[in-house]
């Protein structure tokens, strides 16, 4: 599974069905071994190193590491994939630069390891058209008859005109004035924060983004659900964090233009529970939007733009949620960029992973595969962010205890690290640099843990701020 929010939701459902925790192993970054028993800790490590439990719930990160990472703990898990059934949920979220590597992995498993692969998605990517396509046959498990499809239609996607931020806010206010609850999903945190701050006629409004720690987001989602259940006319302005794994339903949705897969995922939060005959999701192209640092979103947005132009003269693609439109979108997405972009380019080596792992055809009698170099340079998620403990709710107490643990009590530190898991925000280098310059972050010499000690950089509405709120205080 790609997202921790999806894992949390699905893991709970699986446990309820299986009703035997001994059969299930969760292996992802949010799972912490709560026991101080050394034997239990060793058993946990053994399980995660070898994936010996009958049911493994893990992330795409761990799965791809099993194939391509140089770490022995990752390689050891590979044998567990043989003769297994592997379900990839939300497969459309596989990063664009890893499509070829993903195809190699599942093709090998299906062809040589007697492994059954199930790819789940509302917007199934056409992996047969990737630079290095699937080498195994892929069949649809579920095909809806034409006469049945209409019965499942809960939402209509409407392409609106291009607007600036003020136009989006005015459009949103018009919807609010019609007494609908509303979800607005943006491509960046700054866009979401600006729109949130400018909406002023909502009965209740909320903001969601990765600028908030996990526990903060969970608390906001709980408030949103409660308000929706009580017929409060809610407005939520969010980034992509709400697109999957969040079970909420709004009467109207605005999605700033992005990839069609993201648009359809967002539309899944519209009339989700069938509260009305039909819900409406509006696509708005934001004028002057800068997505240079978010190439996957930018590429998807460009492919969607091209498809939307085509809908004007080709009725075949009028319904953006149809299989024909989804296939057309992916065809444009894959062909709009160089095929090698899907092969995991490593800039410091001037080569991609496919080149490193391919045998040199010029040396017929020499196996010339750079497996170690490839593994050392393989990272599913770009590891240029820093995890910072933030002072949200109990996070403030945890930071205080970290600071008072001056003599480095190991057991206390381990306990604090476990408790801090839900109070962490990922910061990019430029954010950390600013916080360090303002002396708002403390780095613990004993552990290297970053603590946000200036309360003015974190608030209950927006999470981690770009600029300090001077009404708050320092630790």
Each predicted region: which residue ranges?
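Conserved Walker A/P-loop ATP-binding site and its immediately adjacent core
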Residues: 1-18, 29-31, 126
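Conserved helicase ATPase motor motifs in RecA-like P-loop NTPase domains
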Residues: 2, 90-130
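Inter-Walker segment of RecA-like/P-loop motor cores
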Residues: 20-68
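Conserved helicase motor
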Residues: 25-40, 187-190, 205-221, 237-243
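Conserved two-lobed SF2 helicase motor
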Residues: 50-70, 228-243, 255
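SF2 helicase catalytic motif II
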Residues: 61-63, 72-109
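C-terminal helicase lobe and adjacent C-terminal extensions/tails of nucleic-acid helicase motors
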Residues: 110, 170-179, 185, 190-200, ...
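Interdomain hinge/linker at the junction between the two RecA-like core domains of SF2 helicases
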Residues: 116, 122-176
């Amino acid at each position: 599974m790609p997202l921790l929010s999806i894992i949390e939701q699905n893991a709970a459902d699986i446990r309820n069905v299986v009703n035997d925790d001994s059969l299930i192993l969760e292996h992802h970054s949010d799972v912490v071994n709560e026991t101080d028993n050394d034997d239990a800790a060793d058993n946990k490590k053994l399980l995660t190193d070898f994936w010996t439990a009958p049911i493994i719930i893990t992330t795409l990160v761990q799965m791809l590491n099993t194939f391509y990472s140089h770490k022995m703990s990752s390689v050891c898990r590979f044998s567990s994939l043989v003769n297994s059934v592997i379900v990839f949920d939300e497969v459309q979220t596989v990063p664009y630069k890893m499509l070829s590597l993903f195809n190699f992995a599942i093709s090998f498993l299906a062809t040589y390891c007697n492994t059954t692969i199930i790819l789940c998605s509302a917007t199934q990517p056409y992996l047969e058209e990737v630079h290095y396509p699937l080498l195994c046959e892929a069949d649809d498990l579920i095909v809806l008859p034409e006469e049945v499809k209409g019965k499942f239609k809960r939402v209509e996607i409407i392409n609106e005109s291009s607007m600036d931020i003020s136009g989006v806010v005015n459009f949103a206010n018009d919807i609010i004035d019609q007494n609908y609850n509303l979800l607005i999903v943006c491509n960046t945190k700054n866009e979401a924060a600006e729109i949130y701050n400018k909406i002023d006629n909502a009965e209740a409004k909320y903001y969601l983004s990765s600028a908030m720690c996990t526990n903060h987001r969970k608390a906001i989602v709980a408030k949103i659900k409660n308000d929706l259940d009580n017929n409060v006319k809610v407005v939520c302005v969010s980034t992509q964090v709400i697109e999957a794994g969040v079970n909420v339903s709004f009467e109207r949705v605005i999605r700033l233009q992005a990839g069609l897969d993201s648009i359809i995922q967002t539309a899944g939060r519209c009339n989700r529970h069938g509260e009305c005959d039909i819900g409406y999701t509006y696509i708005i192209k934001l004028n002057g939007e800068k997505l240079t640092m978010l190439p996957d979103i930018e590429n998807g947005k460009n492919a969607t733009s091209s498809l939307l132009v085509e809908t004007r003269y080709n009725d075949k693609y009028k319904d953006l949620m149809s299989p024909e439109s989804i296939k057309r979108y992916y065809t444009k997405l894959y062909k709009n960029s160089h095929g090698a972009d899907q092969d995991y380019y490593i800039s410091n080596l001037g080569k991609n992973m496919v080149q490193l792992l391919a045998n040199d055809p010029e040396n017929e009698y020499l196996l010339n595969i750079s497996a170690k170099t490839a593994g050392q340079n393989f990272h599913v998620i770009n590891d240029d962010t820093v995890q910072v403990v933030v002072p949200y709710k109990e996070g403030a107490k945890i930071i205080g205890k970290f600071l008072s643990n001056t003599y480095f009590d190991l057991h206390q530190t381990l306990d604090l690290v476990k408790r801090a898991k839900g109070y962490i925000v990922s910061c990019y280098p430029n954010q950390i640099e600013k916080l360090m310059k303002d002396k708002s972050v403390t780095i613990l010499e004993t552990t290297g843990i970053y603590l946000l000690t200036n309360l003015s950089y974190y608030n209950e509405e927006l999470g981690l701020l770009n600029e300090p709120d001077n009404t708050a205080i320092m630790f």
